[in-house]
Amino acid sequence: VLKEQRVPGSFFFTGAFYDQFGNLARQLKADNHYLGAHSEQHLLYAPWTMRDSLLVSRDSFLTDLEANYEKMADLGIDRAAAPFFLPPFEWYNDSIVRWTAAAGLQLINMTYGTLSHADYTTPDMPNYRSSDRILQSILDYEAEQANGLNGFLLLLHIGTDPARTDKFYLHLESLIGELRERGYRLVTLQELFQND
């Protein structure tokens, strides 16, 4: 869909994903999508209930992050071309931000306000959201906010559990069309942050 719609995507994968789906990563790179780091082992950096605490040391954080970049380098993804880091679970604190910056990277995160990130949920989960509900949350947010979705980073998962038969990515073409009708231009992370 992204190729057909000429939309640049930004993909953040773990080292394990790069190992298992190297051919997909190569194809995404060949198609000029951004490929970035999402950690090697998808570690939880801070407790859910005490965000100001840490579950990792600086050394373990950096070792894990560097391992992710090594897997990327094995696929021809140059670190200089991948300066953005999306933390696992999109959960981090000030220490993680500082350590990321000290490593010469920019920590980014999805923009909160929609349910796009719930596209991984399955019907047996208490936080399950249908694809229709997710799509509507995005369009409602756009209509209700003064700045709409300008500068917004929507987080979608490239794949989901087979138990989720209602795949949100099947609604992607519709979402792209609707956003374009509303006057949006979908751009790369680099372009977004250059214009910021």
Residue ranges and their predicted role:
Residues 3-129, 147-160:
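Metal-dependent polysaccharide deacetylase catalytic core of the NodB/CE4 family, i.e.
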Residues 70, 142-146, 185:
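Compositionally biased, intrinsically disordered low-complexity regions enriched in proline and serine
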Residues 131-147:
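A short, acidic, amphipathic alpha-helical segment used as a generic capping/interface helix at domain edges
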Residues 65-66, 131-136, 168-173:
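Well-ordered, non-membrane alpha-helical segments in soluble/globular domains
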Residues 5-9, 19-20, 162-196:
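C-terminal domain-boundary segment and adjacent tail
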